[in-house]
């Protein structure tokens, strides 16, 4: 999970016995930053892993996460549908002043974790610009924390 080969995008899942007797498993997701309440791609990978281990068969299942039950449908060994916990916009048009970049306006949303979603910016969304996008994203994240803007 940690450098030199790991990064924040690597996700681990700690399998636990579920409290809900209808759940096939409990899971706590984490990365090199800390615990994640929910992870969509981690859920897909976990469903495929549970099938590989023989713990689930194709069909609908419940996966217990710290934020609630997530429904998964295993179609076959490599295809999964995830029905996440309910998502919502908590606050709209929230400004944040980011040193060196100016002001951004975004929505705070919940989808298993908290997100700050920015639509209007001057950055090019392309792979060649990934380093700059990462810098700007981290600057926004730090400014949100410093200014106490949270979900």
Regions found by a protein language model. Give the residues of each.
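A glycine-rich beta-to-alpha transition motif near the start of alpha/beta enzyme domains, typified by
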Residues: 1-107, 119-151
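Glycine-rich ThDP/TPP pyrophosphate-binding loop and its adjacent helix/strand module
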Residues: 112
